[in-house]
């Protein structure tokens, strides 16, 4: 199984390091980078074994049809959501991560039923 991100997700994660540092969620830029690196590593390593749900319409309208999402808790207050598409090519299963966000931004669009 192969997990990869589209360029827009890579750019978002790079920008996230700066945002986390500048908004003082982390005192050091290196610590913010480590947090983002660990988040991405968690997604790449564990996405294939996570429970998946169909993505709400809000996300499929913006990031593509046929999306699913999986939840990646980071601490008591923050959960990250990876929105992805799955496809097979040459018998190999691929996971294309098309968007990443967290509950602080997207909670109103996620159905927790």
Give the predicted meaning of each segment.
Residues 4, 35, 68-69, 83-84:
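Aromatic side chains
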Residues 39, 46-47, 84:
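Conserved short aromatic-hydrophobic micro-motifs
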Residues 72-113:
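Enriched for short, Lys/Arg-rich terminal
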Residues 1-42:
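Arg/Lys-rich, positively charged N-terminal/basic patches that mediate binding to nucleic acids
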């Amino acid at each position: 199984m192969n997990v990869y991100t589209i360029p827009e997700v890579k750019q978002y994660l790079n920008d996230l390091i700066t945002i986390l540092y500048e908004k003082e969620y982390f005192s050091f830029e290196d610590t913010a980078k480590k947090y983002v690196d660990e988040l991405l590593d968690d997604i790449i390593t564990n996405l294939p074994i996570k429970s998946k749900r169909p993505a709400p319409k809000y996300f499929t309208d913006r990031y593509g049809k046929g999306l699913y999402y999986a939840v990646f808790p980071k601490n008591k207050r923050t959960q990250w959501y990876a929105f992805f598409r799955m496809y097979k090519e040459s018998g190999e299963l691929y996971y294309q991560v098309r968007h990443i966000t967290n509950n602080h931004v997207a909670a109103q669009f996620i159905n927790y039923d």
